[in-house]
Each structure stands twice: as C-alpha cells, then as structure tokens.
C-alpha cells in the first residue's frame, strides 16, 4: 500500500522531471481530493484506497502532458468563489479580479450592466453576487461557453440574462441601454502564439485568446457600437494585454476624442485596465 504522502512525493519527482514546479503536484492532490492543506496533513499517512490511487494517477498523467489543473479537476477559483470550467472557456486569472473590482466600485447598486465575452461567467456572476440588485447581462459568441456560464450562474443562484452573439450586437437587437460595460475579450495577436506557454496554446480555446488586427478587433467592434447602448456617464472597462494600453487609448480617442481615458496597472506593475466614462 502507499499513503498520500508517498504518492505526493512520487508525483513531485515526476513533475520536476518534466520541468514543472513541485507546487503543481501539490495543488493537483489538493484539488483532486478537494482538500485544504490541513486535510492533507491529517490524512497524509493514511493508506490510499485503490480507487483514489487510480483517480490521482489519471489526473497526474494529464498534468504531466501540460493540461491545466483547472481543466483536469473541472473547477477554478475567482474572487473567493469556485466556478466550473472546461476547455470551452478560459481559466480565470487573478489579474481579472482587479479589473472586476475597478468596475464594481463605479456602479450604482441597481445599474444595468453587461459583461461582453463572458466565457465561464466569472465576471458577470461575481458582480451579481457582490451587488445583488444589479441587472446583469452576459454575452458570448460561443454556445459552449454560454452553457458553462449558465451552469455557473445556477450554481451561484445568480439571475443573469444571457445573450448569445457577437459583442454588442445582441444588446442592440434587444434595444438595451447600459449603465456599465466590462469586457475581457480575446486580445492576443496570433503572431505572439510562439512566445506563449504550450499549456495555454494547446489546451485553452483559441477563440477566447486570439483576435484579428493585432489583437484589437473585438475592442474595435465594441467601441464602434458604444453609442447605441451606453447611457451618459456610464463606466466602460476593458481588460488589456500588458503592452496594449496606449494603442487602445488611441483607438478610442480617434473615435471619441472627448473621452478621458485611464490606463491602470495591475498588482505586478503591468498595464491591465483601460477605463473611461461614456
């Protein structure tokens, strides 16, 4: 028999052989068994049942091939909550929590807002959970991502209006007016794929990562349609790549020269947010 500590030591050895940090093996064990670190300490010398060994070994093999842990275990954390994820939607990043907070702080309690390109729904659902009186709309072009977002909304008992379609087009068709817009759209230039981690490019959905026109195509589509949906004085907040702030600011000002555009850095000192009032 093997205990949990011995199995983890074996996993750490294999993980390091593949060039990954040992913390990946540690997090995998905690997430596969949905344990805290305290749970592991309590059970580390317990013999592992055969079913648990098989379950962990299968997960470990997937991780050693580079698959993200969140896809293996089927969930990810965002702003203290757990959301179901799969390979049809991006894994939420910690930096996106900063984007969400910047937007949240600008909203009236009963505002009507939209999350464009909702993916797994983490932004829309978190905003609704934090301010329950918000009227939250979420859009995505991917039916598979929208199904995941709906499941997450049900899990968190969040009433969200989901509209499938391209950027703001579904809202224009419905005649909806907004008191706020947030979007973390696809914004990576295809040519940058060669510099990215294979864990991202092999497993996360390309449609949610990459955009035409050097990564700006979705931003441009949203910006073009803002006059049709935004109420005066309402916040517009975009998550951006680390080197996109000035270029996106120029795109906005070329279209709407009277706007005051803020470029805000994340906790790591990288440009992360473009924000302005409509």
Swiss-Prot record:
It is an enzyme of class 2 (transferase). GO terms for biological process: methylation; translational termination. Transmembrane segments: none annotated. Signal peptide: none annotated. GO terms for molecular function: nucleic acid binding; protein-(glutamine-N5) methyltransferase activity; protein-glutamine N-methyltransferase activity. The keyword Methyltransferase applies. S-adenosyl-L-methionine binds at residues 117-121, 140, 184. The keyword S-adenosyl-L-methionine applies. Its EC number is 2.1.1.297. Keywords: Methyltransferase, S-adenosyl-L-methionine, Transferase. It catalyses: L-glutaminyl-[peptide chain release factor] + S-adenosyl-L-methionine = N(5)-methyl-L-glutaminyl-[peptide chain release factor] + S-adenosyl-L-homocysteine + H(+). Substrate binds at residues 184-187. CDD domains: AdoMet_MTases. SUPFAM superfamilies: S-adenosyl-L-methionine-dependent methyltransferases. PANTHER family: HEMK METHYLTRANSFERASE, MTRF1L RELEASE FACTOR GLUTAMINE METHYLTRANSFERASE. Belongs to the protein N5-glutamine methyltransferase family. PrmC subfamily. This is Release factor glutamine methyltransferase. It comes from Staphylococcus aureus (strain NCTC 8325 / PS 47).
């Amino acid at each position: 028999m093997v205990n949990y500590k011995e199995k983890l030591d074996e996993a750490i050895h294999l993980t390091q052989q593949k060039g990954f940090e040992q913390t990946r093996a540690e997090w995998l064990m905690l997430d596969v068994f949905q344990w805290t670190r305290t749970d592991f300490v309590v059970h580390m010398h317990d013999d592992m049942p055969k079913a648990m060994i098989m379950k962990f070994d299968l997960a470990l093999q997937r991780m050693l091939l580079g698959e993200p842990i969140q896809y293996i275990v089927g969930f990810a954390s965002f702003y203290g909550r757990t959301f179901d994820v799969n390979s049809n939607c991006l894994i939420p990043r910690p930096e996106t929590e900063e984007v969400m907070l910047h937007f949240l702080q600008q909203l009236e309690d009963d505002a009507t807002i939209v999350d464009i390109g909702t993916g797994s729904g983490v932004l829309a659902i978190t905003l609704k959970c934090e301010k329950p009186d918000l009227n939250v709309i979420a859009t995505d072009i991917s039916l598979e991502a929208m199904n995941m977002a709906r499941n997450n909304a049900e899990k968190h008992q969040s009433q969200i209006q989901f509209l499938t379609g391209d950027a703001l087009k579904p809202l224009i068709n419905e005649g909806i007016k907004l008191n706020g817009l947030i979007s973390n759209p696809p914004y990576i230039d295809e040519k940058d794929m060669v510099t990215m981690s294979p864990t991202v490019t092999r497993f996360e959905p390309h449609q949610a990562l990459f955009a035409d026109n050097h990564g700006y195509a979705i931003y441009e589509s949203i910006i073009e349609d803002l006059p049709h949906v935004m109420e005066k004085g309402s916040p517009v907040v975009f998550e951006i790549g680390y080197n996109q702030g000035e270029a996106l600011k120029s795109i906005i000002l070329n279209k709407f020269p009277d706007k005051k555009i803020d470029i805000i850095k994340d906790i790591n000192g990288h440009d992360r947010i473009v924000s302005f009032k409509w």
